[in-house]
Amino acid sequence: MSFPDSKTHQNLKAAFAGESQANRRYTWMAQVAEKEGLPEVAALFKHSADGETGHALKHLMFLAAQAGDPATGMPLGDSLTNLKSAVAGETYEYTDMYPEFARLAREEGYGEIAAWFETLAKVERFHAGRFQDALTKLQSGTMAAPDADIAKHI
């Protein structure tokens, strides 16, 4: 059985998604605890979030080696390859995913959520452009020192 057709592949994708989401949830919970003046609880959540990131990265390592990017299905590896996958992922998000999410949210009467999805589509388009610019520069050999402004938008 090929790896992409295996239950192990599906389990790794689910585990990667779950651990990644746990990281974000615990990061948010740490912020709540900080606002509540509970630094020990915040530290516990931050430490746990870091652990979940480690788990997710190991899952991604297996996925990358066996089946590529779990979001795009494209290969992962060196920066050139990773940029191609990032462009594809961000492009899908701004051309298909978020516009459809916004349409459905608006149709169901959730205008604020629809507006949020529309905003995200614009941000993802910006991300795709930044990744595409980096890809073009890397392919042409004109990649310069990292742009400090990039971190503001990631």
Where do the PLM segments sit?
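Non-heme di-metal
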Residues: 1-154
